């Protein structure tokens, strides 16, 4: 993981694209890079909701509680929603390549806790950050004069509600997310 000059969103996209490159060229190093990034992020920079980051960056490993409550950064700027979205893209791609269920377990937990909770049910607007510190309220974008990166991915999140409930292979269908649904 690079130094703090790069946002987590940039990091995530690099590893997702590396994984796409590995599918084209069969270079194991790209797959290994994506797997390592995913594992480091989940093990050392992720909150219980599945979201991660502080002020769009990774800081010291295993210090997310400090980042959320006592750091010099604004405690309301944890868990950037579009970074969470990109971790879901990476998780799905890693699952498709490896078949390892841990990626879909993370996907289900994160989609349920971080993505579904990121939309205002009354207005449809979305959140940029999801504060993990106690005492913070949710802040949603204003519908007509405020547009963040997470506004765009926020719309995309809710256009994919049924995308990963099931995965299909040649000889089976697997339930990946236990939501009320019917396979089509």
Regions found by a protein language model. Give the residues of each.
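Glycan-recognition and catalytic cores of secretory/periplasmic carbohydrate-active enzymes
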Residues: 1-184
